[in-house]
Design a protein with these regions (language model features):
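Short, small-residue-biased leader/transition segments that mark boundaries at the very start
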Residues: 1-3
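Hydrophobic alpha-helical core bundles mediating ligand binding, dimerization, or RNAP-core interactions
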Residues: 15, 19, 97-108
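Basic amphipathic alpha-helical segments that dock to polyanions
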Residues: 57, 61-64
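Short beta-strand "wing" residues that participate in macromolecule-binding interfaces
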Residues: 72
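Basic, amphipathic "hinge/linker" alpha-helix immediately C-terminal to the N-terminal HTH DNA-binding motif
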Residues: 76-99
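Short, charged recognition helix plus adjacent turn
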Residues: 110-114
C-alpha cells in the first residue's frame, strides 16, 4: 500500500498522509473533544484537555483548521467569542476514533493481564 520513494503524499502512502494530518501529542485528543461537542469555545476546550498550554492549543487548532478538519467561527462581539467545531471531513474521523478507543481498551487489558 505504501511506497517509500513518494514520501508522505497520498500516492506514496495514505496512512502516512493521514498520520501527518493528526500527528502530535494533542491533535487526536482535540479531535476527540470536538467530536463530543457540536461547538466548543477555546477556554472550555483547554479545560477539557488538561495540561495543554494556550499556545499549543492555538497552534494545534490552526494546523487542524489548515487541514480542513476544524472550523473556527469568530463573532464580532466584545468580548470576542470564538467557537470551534469539526468540519464534515473532521466528523468523518469519528468511526476511526471509536475504533482506536476499542483497540486502546484491548491493549490496556492485554498489558494489565501481563
Amino acid at each position: 500500500m505504501c511506497s517509500s520513494d513518494l514520501g508522505n503524499t497520498m500516492e506514496g502512502c495514505p496512512v502516512k498522509f493521514a498520520l501527518g494530518l493528526v500527528s502530535g501529542k494533542w491533535k487526536l485528543r482535540i479531535l476527540w473533544e470536538l467530536n463530543q461537542q457540536e461547538v466548543i469555545r477555546f477556554n472550555e476546550l483547554q479545560r477539557r484537555l488538561e495540561g495543554i498550554s494556550s499556545v499549543m492549543l492555538s497552534k494545534s487548532l490552526e494546523e487542524l483548521e489548515r487541514a480542513r478538519l476544524v472550523h473556527r467561527e469568530q463573532y464580532p462581539e466584545i468580548p470576542p467569542r470564538v467557537e470551534y467545531s469539526l468540519t464534515a471531513l473532521g466528523r468523518s474521523i469519528d468511526p476511526y476514533l471509536r475504533a482506536l478507543g476499542e483497540w486502546g481498551m484491548q491493549a490496556y487489558e492485554a498489558i494489565q493481564a501481563g
